[in-house]
């Protein structure tokens, strides 16, 4: 919700949310998944906004120079094996991650799979801005058992954005 957006991003250290829009009051939101930081669960912000051609080109140029990695969802990546709706680790996805332990994690974006956007997994471009291992929120706001990533990533964060057609999806995930 737009009402909670500013409040939620204010709860995170500035460096974690620096890539997110400061406010979304005047923007039409495509979809939002905003979760107040709390323990036991993955803390995340997924924000989808419409993105016109000129804004898209500006973002592409900025991201090309700022991103630590540029991916497509079919690439060999360390994927967060997490079900956001049920707050559960998807064990089969967790096992699939083992060969990619040395890569930086990105979200799975499972809510975009199939449905209204059947070509999302083929055409979306992921710009990973940063990901680090460690504790970046107070202990009582961190997931207690990790999120199904290899042990080296028991706590950490990933942030970035996805460009897909006329949308930009911003993400931050902290565990």
Sequence positions of predicted segments:
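Short, exposed beta-strand-loop hairpins at the edges of beta-sheets
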Residues: 150-165, 172-173
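Short linear interaction motifs
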Residues: 128-153
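Surface-exposed acidic loop/strand-edge motifs in secreted or periplasmic proteins
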Residues: 2-124
């Amino acid at each position: 919700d737009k009402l909670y957006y500013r409040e939620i991003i204010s709860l995170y250290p500035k460096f974690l949310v620096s890539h997110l829009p400061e406010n979304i009051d005047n923007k039409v939101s495509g979809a939002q998944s905003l979760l107040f930081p709390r323990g036991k669960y993955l803390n995340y912000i997924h924000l989808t906004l419409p993105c016109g051609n000129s804004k898209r080109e500006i973002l592409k140029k900025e991201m090309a120079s700022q991103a630590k990695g540029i991916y497509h969802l079919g690439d060999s990546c360390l994927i967060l094996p997490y079900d956001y709706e049920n707050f559960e680790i998807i064990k089969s996805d967790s096992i699939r991650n083992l060969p990619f332990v040395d890569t930086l994690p990105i979200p799975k974006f499972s809510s975009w799979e199939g449905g209204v956007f059947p070509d999302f997994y083929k055409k979306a471009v992921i710009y990973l801005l940063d990901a680090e291992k460690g504790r970046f929120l107070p202990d009582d706001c961190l997931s207690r058992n990790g999120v199904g990533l290899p042990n080296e990533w028991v706590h950490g964060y990933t942030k970035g954005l996805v460009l897909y057609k006329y949308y930009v999806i911003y993400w931050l995930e902290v565990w």
